[in-house]
A protein has these predicted regions:
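N-terminal Rossmann-like FAD-binding beta1-loop-alpha1 element of flavoenzymes
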Residues: 9-34
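Extreme N-terminal leader/targeting segments of oxidoreductases
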Residues: 1-9, 27, 211, 215, ...
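Internal hydrophobic alpha-helix adjacent to the cofactor/substrate pocket in enzyme cavities
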Residues: 306-313, 441, 548-569
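A glycine-rich dinucleotide-binding beta-alpha-beta segment and adjacent secondary-structure elements
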Residues: 236, 243, 439-534, 538
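Conserved N-terminal/central alpha/beta ligand/cofactor-binding core
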Residues: 37-227, 350-353, 360, 394-397, ...
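Helix-rich C-terminal "cap"/substrate-channel and partner-interaction subdomain
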Residues: 381-488, 556-559, 563
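Glycine-rich loop(s) and the adjacent beta-strand/alpha-helix scaffold that form part
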Residues: 204-211, 223, 251-330, 546, ...
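An anion/pyrophosphate-binding glycine-rich loop and adjacent beta-alpha core
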Residues: 129, 134-185, 304-306, 310-435
């Protein structure tokens, strides 16, 4: 794609926030270019679940007409605690629904409602439905030749490359394929379609979740004539008279300068692979413990580093500096390693998580972020930050465990490559994993005592709508709790990972990058995970990165357009 050396706005990054900012500004009449470090576009968004938490959106209002501004504000006050930002939260509540309507009306973006509860639905202002929406599945042939530039989904959460919608409605058919004719036929159709796509295009073309979100946004940008320059990393902000006026970038091996008449918006995905910064920010890394992130390895903090280099402040202050995700390391062979995020198995009845001492430490059916935070705290003073998810053979066959798929898929290779641990008895499993055998046997005995009645008095599994949402509704009386039966027993070792950083560049509500003295750096903006999260290091619901990121991308795009037209932010 051809490009010039001067635009109104330069956006650095092709995730949901960057493309939202670019599209909004373009629709307002600005001349925009988007730069992408990788040879493919989509960023972390393309690997994600594609869910947006946008309270009071028009889809959610149909599901839950009783939701209100007051309820959302109360919920956010509770969830963010001392980090509650009145102006930012008010703007998010006001502009989020407008953002959804704008993108559905003006672009190729389409959303569908989900059944996700808030992650803490019983908290003040929490809701059991209506706040999370999902990108509608998309046929990437609509991108034309640019379909080859769409970042593929995370390999570990596909089945032979086939994607699943991150709403529970899609996945339930795959878990029920051997029990229900309807589900069997659904799965068979999906598999046949996918095999045809692989034969013709060497990848899935019917994409869902974050891949659909990234694809729809990219199509919208490309349809508007916005150049998306891949393999074009930005390395430096060009400053003149204290104002950001462009970036230095490398393209085709040449160092070049692209000028911005109005501004530069950083949307580089935060710093989950900036080793120096995360070692300072992540508590378990300070202890020298393992961390694996499924986010793109190219997210090395380019935006935060460029902002700092010109006087911007990176706000490292949240107790939880990132969105935690318990993960396992997956060996694919030939030296290829993947990261599997534990999104589903922890909720299932008959699966429990224990530390090296053999003891449970939290409600396994809480959100990934809450389980991660509990794991970091529980492993304080231990030699590693890790837990083992374990179950019996029946449960493994029914639900799978981590990257191990349910029956009838074979498990032998996972045992041979060390991903899956096996033991005929609990003591054998403890010996194989290094777990304390007495602690493990005691834990399972105590757990089973109550599990036969569907109860978990120690941690309350199944006590919230969110606990139950990804569990097994056919397991009575508690969809999250079942006893661990006879051996053999199986376990996977889970370490800490993340879905992206919460700490980030300090900005105004409109996204203007701030100096340490609180003044604005003219012409420099930050959106998405480059910008400090409004959630204060908490994770209140499904899509609390994409929802605010797209909303504030929209806000920043409008703000820059307003500046160009002599309008003030407060007027629109």
């Amino acid at each position: 794609m051809s490009y010039r050396n001067e635009y109104d706005l330069i956006v650095v990054g092709t995730g949901a926030a960057g493309l939202s900012c670019a599209i909004t500004a373009k629709k307002r009449g600005l001349d925009v270019v988007v730069l992408e470090k990788e040879p493919v576009f989509g960023g972390t968004t393309a690997l994600s679940g594609g869910v947006l938490w946008v309270p009071l959106n028009h889809h959610g209002r149909k599901q839950n007409p009783g939701d209100s501004v007051e309820a959302v504000r109360t919920f956010m006050m509770h969830e963010t605690g001392s980090y509650f930002d009145e102006e930012a939260i008010r703007t998010f509540i006001e502009q989020g629904p407008k953002m959804v309507e704008f993108f559905e009306r003006e672009t190729a973006m389409k959303f569908i409602p989900t059944l996700y509860p808030d992650y803490h639905p019983d908290a003040p202002g929490g809701m059991e439905i209506g706040r999370s929406i999902l990108a509608e599945p998309f046929d990437i042939r609509g991108l034309g030749k640019d379909m080859e530039r769409l970042k593929p989904p995370l390999k570990t959460i596909t089945f032979i490359g086939m994607m699943f919608n991150s709403s529970n409605a899609d996945l339930k058919h795959f878990f029920r394929a051997t029990k229900s004719v309807t589900s069997f036929l659904y799965v068979a159709r999906r598999l046949l379609t996918h095999i045809k796509e692989l034969a013709l295009y060497r990848r899935a073309v019917q994409v869902t979740s974050g891949n659909a979100l990234a694809a729809r946004l990219a199509k919208s940008a490309l349809d508007l004539g916005i150049p998306i320059l891949t393999s074009t990393p930005a390395s430096k902000i060009v400053m003149e008279n204290g104002k950001a006026v462009g970036v230095v970038t490398g393209r085709d091996g040449d160092v070049q300068e692209i000028r911005a008449r109005l501004g530069v918006a950083l949307a580089c995905g935060g710093f989950p692979h900036d080793v120096k910064r995360i070692t300072q920010a992540y508590p378990h890394l300070k202890r020298g413990h393992e961390h694996l992130s499924p986010t793109p390895t190219s997210n090395t903090g380019d935006g935060t580093n460029m902002a700092e280099a010109v006087g911007g402040v990176v706000d490292i202050r949240f107790k939880e500096p990132a969105a935690w995700m318990p993960v396992t390391r997956v060996e694919f062979g030939n030296g290829e390693v993947g990261v599997f995020p534990h999104l589903l198995d922890r909720y299932k009845p008959g699966v429990i998580g224990v530390l090296k001492n053999g003891r449970r430490f939290t409600n396994e059916s809480n959100s990934y972020h809450d389980v991660g935070a509990a794991m970091i705290e529980a492993c304080r003073g231990m030699q590693e930050t890790a837990m083992w998810l374990l179950c019996d053979r029946r449960t493994l066959g029914k639900y799978g465990l981590g990257y191990v798929k349910p029956s009838p898929m074979p498990i032998g290779r996972f045992i041979r490559n060390g991903y899956l641990f096996e033991g005929k008895t609990l003591a054998d499993l403890a010996h194989a994993t290094g777990i304390d055998p007495a602690g493990l046997e005691s834990t399972v005995r105590e757990y089973n005592q109550h599990a036969v009645q569907g109860k978990d008095p120690e941690f309350g599994r199944g006590s919230t709508a969110f606990n139950r949402y990804l569990a097994d509704p056919e397991n009575k009386p508690n969809p999250c709790v079942a006893p661990i039966g006879h051996g053999p027993y199986y376990a996977v070792k889970v370490v800490m990972g993340d879905l992206g950083t919460f700490d980030g560049i300090k900005t105004t509500v409109a996204g203007e990058v701030l100096r340490r003295d609180g003044s604005v750096i003219p012409g420099l903006f930050a959106v998405g995970n480059d910008r400090a999260s409004i959630m204060g290091g908490n994770y209140p619901g499904a899509g609390i990165t994409h929802g605010p990121n797209m909303t504030f991308g929209y806000v920043t795009g409008n703000y820059i357009a307003d500046l160009s037209q002599g309008r003030k932010f407060s007027q629109w």
